[in-house]
Amino acid sequence: MSNNNKYYDKSFSPLGYVANGQKGVMRSINWNVINDPKDLEVWTRVTQNFWLPEKIPVSNDLKSWNELTPEWKQLVTRTFTGLTLLDTIQCTLGDIAQIPNSLTDHEQFVYANFSFMVGVHARSYGTIFSTLNTSDEIEEAHEWVINNEKLQARAKFLVPYYTSDDPLKSKIAAALMPGFLLYGGFYLPFYLAARGKLPNTSDIIRLILRDKVIHNYYSGYKYRLKVQKLPKEKQEEYKKFVFEILYKLIELEKDFLRELYDGFGLADEAIAFSLYNAGKFLQNCGYESPFTPEETKISPEVFAQLSARADENHDFFSGNGSSYIMGVTEETQDDDWEF
């Protein structure tokens, strides 16, 4: 902090005030003095990318939805309900848990924003259900979620780390959900969109994916900032932890995906898609991916869906996608009406 901001060292953020036994004075967040430029950069990108599922014409997918067999309809509905559970956990536990351990006041606000963003993702699946499904189908899917042991096992796995006394382990867990665990489910709408099915629904998934890329990148970045300050021995301990927790989660994910996609022939490539993104997660944390090209091989038509229609790629600084554009209002001048 510069000398012009002496107040900073004499005060606490509201969370810091509580952690200090409610002693001292609280400061307001100052967006005119940025401790870490990445906080403002990510905040700006997230707010520029803001979207709502109600703006996506999911009803245009009704024709192709009705062309699916009952088995495929159930698979889609269950897959999306499983994703809803993961986003429910991330919204109400994962991102909230990062706020008290933030390095800056602005990081607290970024994670508060992330929590809302993930809430929008969870809501978006509800929009899809209310458009495509009957009430009985929705009820069946939510019943399936609470009764599927393999789904529950992978969903519960990260919870103890979110609430851990170790902020770095919590940070890794917060990065694993948007960085790895969701992608086996994301694979299905991209597979269908490549075959002309549910294109507007897949647009929603692309928008979610765009947000997840930012989410995972930022958590990995904050993890690296903290780890690099530690002694080498401690750094190696955390590296070992990251790989151990990831490999355990991969096994849980494989078990779940093989059951989910049983009879549809999609499990192997969905697993490859998950491993591809597991490698990206590791890179965001500062580690090399151990996965071979063969392990992460995805069919070209599915891979192309990552950028189709939304006109996006995994460089989140490239801007909004074409599938969802927010309007910009500009006051007109007299000269504008001289044709």
Swiss-Prot record:
A molecular function (GO) term: ribonucleoside-diphosphate reductase activity, thioredoxin disulfide as acceptor
The protein's enzyme class: oxidoreductase
Disulfide bonds, paired cysteine numbers: none
Residues bound to Fe cation 1: 87, 121
Pfam families, alphabetized: Ribonuc_red_sm (PF00268)
Coiled-coil spans in chain: none
Transmembrane segment boundaries: none
Enzyme active site: 125
Reactions this protein catalyses: a 2'-deoxyribonucleoside 5'-diphosphate + [thioredoxin]-disulfide + H2O = a ribonucleoside 5'-diphosphate + [thioredoxin]-dithiol
GO biological process, one term: deoxyribonucleotide biosynthetic process
Entry GO CC: ribonucleoside-diphosphate reductase complex
Cross-referenced InterPro entries: Ferritin-like_SF, RNR-like, RNR_NrdF-like, RNR_small, RNR_small_fam
Positions of Fe cation 2 binding: 215
Its EC number(s): 1.17.4.1
Family: Belongs to the ribonucleoside diphosphate reductase small chain family.
Self-association and partners: Tetramer of two alpha and two beta subunits.
Identification of the protein by name: Ribonucleoside-diphosphate reductase subunit beta
Gene coding for it: nrdF
